[in-house]
Amino acid sequence: TALKNAVRIGAKQYLIFGAGYDSFAYRQPEWASHIQIFELDRFILLQDKQRRLKSNQIAMPGNVYYLETDFAQKQWQKKIINHPAFDAAKNSFCSLLGLVYYLTKQEFVNLLLAISAFVPKGSSVVFDYPDENFFDVVPMQPVYVRRNRQY
């Protein structure tokens, strides 16, 4: 996987932006036990996740940190930079998988610029993204198809 390769070539931190109910930290393989994992998301979601983990008696590994973050707020990155387990000198693997769909185009650009300002050269960012029409505000027009004919 991309994360495993990043760790193999030197990544020491895994930042999961918009972590939601991501479960990597709780099923992490041995090779990942030596990296710091930061789950970043809104307070309510992180709180609910912790409640669910606790009610199912799933312990939080010692290398996992929850950081309440709202990427729309100014200076959200201070929560990461100021966290005692985060080391700005160590390469990071940053996952934005599933997050871009919730951001405007400008918020996405700002997020990438902010990340590039606090992770060192050699770090990685992985993301998925919608096609160019996703950000258009124009509503979709219905198309009716009957027997392979467009009406």
Q: Could you tell me what each predicted segment is?
A:
Residues 1-19, 23-151:
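Alpha-helical subdomain
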